[in-house]
From Swiss-Prot:
Location in the cell: Virion; Host nucleus
Family: Belongs to the influenza viruses NEP family.
Key words of the record: Host nucleus, Host-virus interaction, Transport, Virion
Key word ATP-binding present: no
Protein's job: Mediates the nuclear export of encapsidated genomic RNAs (ribonucleoproteins, RNPs). Acts as an adapter between viral RNPs complexes and the nuclear export machinery of the cell. Possesses no intrinsic RNA-binding activity, but includes a C-terminal M1-binding domain. This domain is believed to allow recognition of RNPs bound to the protein M1.
Protein name per Swiss-Prot or TrEMBL: Nuclear export protein
One Pfam assignment: Flu_NS2
One of the GO BP terms on file: exit of virus from host cell nucleus through nuclear pore
Motif (Nuclear export signal): 12-21, 85-94
Entries under InterPro entries matching the protein: Flu_NS2
Signal peptide, first to last residue: none
One GO cellular component term noted in the UniProt record for this chain: virion component
Organism: Influenza A virus (strain A/Brazil/11/1978 H1N1)
Other notes: Average number present in a viral particle is estimated to be 130-200 molecules.
Length: 121
């Protein structure tokens, strides 16, 4: 796990939590929750890769491992689309920078999860 990615997650989450988007604050809270969930999932996959023998225990604990992986990719795609949409509609430069960084982070995390999952398959 790249320490820069960890600090990026923390930075993005902190920035998003400070945003006031009016009526869409519920949506923003949902995005923050999904970012946190995605970070935890990515971290757990990374730990499983570090302990390569964990593939079998991971599969035994969670018989629907591949299905869960597919759901995470769906969440990433949804978050990417949501962040792109927010980026298009916001005029606040702080929010634009935050959403651009969030988008870059999502692309990096998607690639990391793909790499981890290929190593585990």
């Amino acid at each position: 796990m790249d320490p820069n990615t960890v600090s990026s997650f923390q930075d993005i989450l902190m920035r998003m939590s400070k945003m006031q988007l009016g009526s869409s604050s519920e949506d923003l809270n949902g995005m923050i929750t999904q970012f946190e969930s995605l970070k935890l999932y990515r971290d757990s996959l990374g730990e499983a890769v570090m302990r390569m023998g964990d593939l079998h225990s991971l599969q035994n604990r969670n018989g629907k491992w591949r299905e869960q992986l597919g759901q995470k990719f769906e969440e990433i795609r949804w978050l990417i689309e949501e962040v792109r949409h927010r980026l298009k509609i916001t005029e606040n430069s702080f929010e634009q920078i935050t959403f651009m960084q969030a988008l870059q982070l999502l692309f990096e995390v998607e690639q990391e999860i793909r790499t981890f999952s290929f190593q585990l398959i």
